Amino acid sequence: MKNIDNPSEKIIIALDGMDKDDVVNLLKKIPEIVWVKVGLELFVSEGPDVLSMLREKGKKIFLDLKFHDIPTTVARACFAASQTGAEFISLHTCAGMKALKMANEAANEGASKVNLIPPKLLGITILTSWTRESFCNDLLINQSIDQRVKHLAEIASNSGLGGCVCSPKEVQFLRESYPETFELITPGIRSLGSNVNDQSRVSDASEAIKMGASKLVIGRAITQSNDSAYMFKSFCDKISI
């Protein structure tokens, strides 16, 4: 594995369970944060203003709204989202190749219209909360999760997306198939002994990076820690080894 000169670039802080004031306080505690993830909860409660605030503070944004609808609706959503200045925007690969291709074109068009660099669209494969048992029982899908993730990542790549979101358990075999320019964004990162909460397919930070993850999404392990700054530094130290 290559030496990582700036490990903070590899960590995306998930701002889940936080309001705008919480976010401001966290950024004061950890000014080294480079990337943040704004999900449904924060975006719905605070609106686009929170994105403007984060941009003003010089943060890079992963807008994780996981768009999943008919192709025209997904494309229009990505057109609008691309004008927020977010560097990454997520959408479900299960929306299908037509939706993904239209979304990619719309995001490029939307960003260009306001003189912004187009964002990378990231295809959601299988959420880290799914287990093999629930995958089969709830969705009646007989494929293994690995097989399904591999197929959905291929759809993302063939549609022109900039990468995909997958659990640490799938990173290694995906990285063998895709170059480093194809982002593999990995949630489900936990520190040793921490609670996995509602995620099932998890790993530690060092292993995920070694297996080929581009960036790690880390939330509660840092944001709910008694010493968030220490935990952030601890994760940076782990992935720089």
From Swiss-Prot:
The active site is at residue 66. Keywords: Decarboxylase, Lyase, Pyrimidine biosynthesis. Substrate binds at residues 16, 37, 64-73, 128, 190, 199, 219-220. GO terms for molecular function: orotidine-5'-phosphate decarboxylase activity. It catalyses: orotidine 5'-phosphate + H(+) = UMP + CO2. Pfam families: OMPdecase. GO terms for cellular component: cytosol. Pathway: Pyrimidine metabolism; UMP biosynthesis via de novo pathway; UMP from orotate: step 2/2. InterPro entries: Aldolase_TIM (IPR013785), OMPdecase (IPR014732), OMPdecase_AS (IPR018089), OMPdecase_bac (IPR047596), OMPdeCOase_dom (IPR001754), RibuloseP-bd_barrel (IPR011060). Its EC number is 4.1.1.23. It comes from the Bacteria. One of its GO terms (biological process) is 'de novo' pyrimidine nucleobase biosynthetic process. HAMAP family: OMPdecase_type1_B. Catalyzes the decarboxylation of orotidine 5'-monophosphate (OMP) to uridine 5'-monophosphate (UMP). Homodimer. Belongs to the OMP decarboxylase family. Type 1 subfamily. This is Orotidine 5'-phosphate decarboxylase. The gene is pyrF.
